[in-house]
């Protein structure tokens, strides 16, 4: 009969292995017709001003994907969400997220579902119930060695 410690250790290991992560990572800036700068100019604004680029209206929206978390900055609003599920769908990924504890009201957690499509290594689209937004990846544009 296995020891209780071994059983607990194995169960914790299996939960860690089941953690889901986003299919993309890093900083992404929205490509928006009301902000008619080229994608590389948008990313320069993000590199120069960071999150302030959004509040200064140099960039309409910025998203940071980090493992199972997504940080979204739009105007003066910043949100943090965590993946609840990710599934292949419609040539992309159907992602369901829940908002962080700071976004909860009376212990209720709001969920969001959308489709994320990877168009190429530097461009993604996010389709939600109301609209589609295209994003350009900010960071080194050099291919890895």
Language-model segments: which ranges?
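Short, solvent-exposed aromatic-acidic interface loops
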Residues: 35, 76-78, 129-133
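N-terminal signal peptide c-region/cleavage motif recognized by signal peptidases
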Residues: 14-16
């Amino acid at each position: 009969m296995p020891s209780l410690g071994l059983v607990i250790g194995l169960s914790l290991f299996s939960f860690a292995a089941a953690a889901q992560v986003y299919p993309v990572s890093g900083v992404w800036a929205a490509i928006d017709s009301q902000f008619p700068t080229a994608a590389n100019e948008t990313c320069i604004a993000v590199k120069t001003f960071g999150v302030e680029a959004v509040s200064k209206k140099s960039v309409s929206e910025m998203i940071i994907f980090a493992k199972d978390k997504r940080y979204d900055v739009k105007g003066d609003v910043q949100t943090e969400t965590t993946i609840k599920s990710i599934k292949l769908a419609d040539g992309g990924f159907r992602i369901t997220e829940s908002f962080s504890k700071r976004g909860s009201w009376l212990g209720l957690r709001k969920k969001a579902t959308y489709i994320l499509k990877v168009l190429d290594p530097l461009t993604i689209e996010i389709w939600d119930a109301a609209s589609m937004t295209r994003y350009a990846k900010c960071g080194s544009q050099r291919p890895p060695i």
